[in-house]
Amino acid sequence: MAFGMLIYILLKAMGALSEEAALTASSLSTELWNSWTKNNTEAYYAEQPRLLKLMQTCLEEHHSYCINGLCAFHSELRKPICKCLAGYNGERCEHLTLNSYAHNSYERYIAVGIGIGILTSGILAIIYCYVRKRCRKLKSPYKVCMGETAL
């Protein structure tokens, strides 16, 4: 019963989050589109680069062409193109750009060297203590220990 309740709560939370994300993405795309195509007047186009002059809003049939971005119709190419949201790339903004972190190889070698040094020191210390303890047990006035002769 408790497990079923937990699953129910998790599913409700996931549903609420997905609805909120959909609302945020649609409002974000509207804001981006509005800032991208501010004005359609000739004066505005005269100040814009040539590429932006060739772009128009997508037709209704291409409305869902871009997966994670904004759709624009290129008049010379006569095909829809996408302006991807941050973190996405590809022709239809279908690929998520993953962050990669390269570790400096010298740091790794130093860490491995220190680890091996500590391990070797520990093993040598254990061997030294074992031999010394053994030598003390065997040492008597009449016995030889570690090459020493008795008095």
From Swiss-Prot:
Task: Name any Gene Ontology BP term.
Answer: angiogenesis
Going by the UniProt record, its keywords in alphabetical order are: Disulfide bond, EGF-like domain, Glycoprotein, Growth factor, Membrane, Signal, Transmembrane, Transmembrane helix
InterPro entries attached here?
EGF-like_dom (IPR000742)
Q: Name one GO cellular component term.
A: plasma membrane
Q: Does the keyword Thylakoid apply?
A: no
| UniProt subcellular location | Membrane
Any idea what job this protein has?
Promotes the growth of epithelial cells.
Disulfide bond sites: C58-C71, C66-C82, C84-C93
Q: Which GO terms describe its molecular function?
A: epidermal growth factor receptor binding; growth factor activity; transmembrane receptor protein tyrosine kinase activator activity
Residue ranges that the UniProt entry lists as topological domain Extracellular: 19-108
TM stretches of this protein:
109-129
According to UniProt, the name of this protein is Epigen
The signal sequence is 1-18
- PANTHER family to which the protein is assigned, alphabetical: EPIGEN, TRANSFORMING GROWTH FACTOR ALPHA
Q: Which SUPFAM superfamilies did the record assign?
A: EGF/Laminin (SSF57196)
Residue numbers on the Cytoplasmic membrane side:
130-151
**Residues that carry a glycan:** N39
Entry membrane topology: Single-pass type I membrane protein
Protein species of origin: Gallus gallus
- Specify the EGF-like domain's residue ranges: 54-94
**Primary localisation category:** membrane
